[in-house]
Structures are given as C-alpha cells and as structure tokens.
Amino acid sequence: PPRAWAQRHLVHALFYALRTGCGRRYLPREYPPWQTAYTTFRQWRLQGIWQCVHEALRRAVRLRAGRHANPSPAIMDSQSVKTTEESGGIKGYDGGKQVKGRKRHVLVDTLRLLLSVEVTPAKTSDQAGARRLLIGLKPLQPRLELIWADGPYSGDPLATWCAAEGAWRVEIIKPTSHGQGF
C-alpha cells in the first residue's frame, strides 16, 4: 500500500520535536499524526537506521576535516544531570556531586564527535559506566587504541578490562594548575 506521508515529512516531524522539545503528542497539524511519527521513529531506532545515519555523518565530518574516518584516540567522561520528580526512567543519587538524577557517560573523538553514549542512574560509578559505554565498541571503532579520561576512571580494574575488551590503553589526564582536566 502507498504511504500516507512522505518520509521527508516524517523526518521533518521528528526533527521538529527534537529541536523544539515539544512532546510528541503536540506536533503541529502540518506534520504527520504523532502516532505515525512516533511509530516511524521507533521502527527506525529498532532497525538501527539512526545509528547508521549518525555513523555516516560522523565519518563524513572527519573526512572533511582531513582525518581518518575512524579515530584512534578518544575522550571519555561523564556528567550527572538533575531530574524532576515527574521525569520517568532511570535515576539515582550521585553522592560525590550531590545530584539526584541520571548520569551521561560519553565517548567522543578529538573533534568532539560522539562515538558512544550510555545513560545510567546517577549513582553508577564512572568505572561501571565506562564498561557499559565501551562494551561491544571494538567492531564499530576498529582503529580505537587510546582513551583519555579523568581521575574517576583511574585504577587497574578498568585498565585491565579495557585492554582485554578492545586492546585499548586508558590514559588518565591530570587537571591543570587551573583545576581543569579536559
């Protein structure tokens, strides 16, 4: 059967919701019905289409910048983010940062392009989050050799695990005299 909405309209609806932060049920009338847009988004996510689009764009940006399509070094960090009582999903309490909410664990290349992201409860340690972030990454990032990280990632257990999981070397970056790491 023919599609009721062109894929371009569906993509525009998804980008509109992403850009404005509007709830999916509040899409303006010029876009497909929210149920259609959400179903399309969900199907594409489950099929890995968004991941493929992201990878293609990231590789294109790297090549345009004169870099290899896949990086050899990367930077790993985390950030605890407050959530509200109404927000659903995973949450916890990060005692070190005094934050009740979620923690984003990210791996970026030297151009600050996202390689991997994992969202956990805020109470998740950086070392445990790093394992969740990196597991299964080797086939997607075959050239990755070096991961720069800050103090919470130091220690032999993570370094040993990284060496075994992906033959990655973890190098801890010390803060400068100004108190900044990255």
Predicted segment positions?
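Short alpha-helical elements
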Residues: 1-182
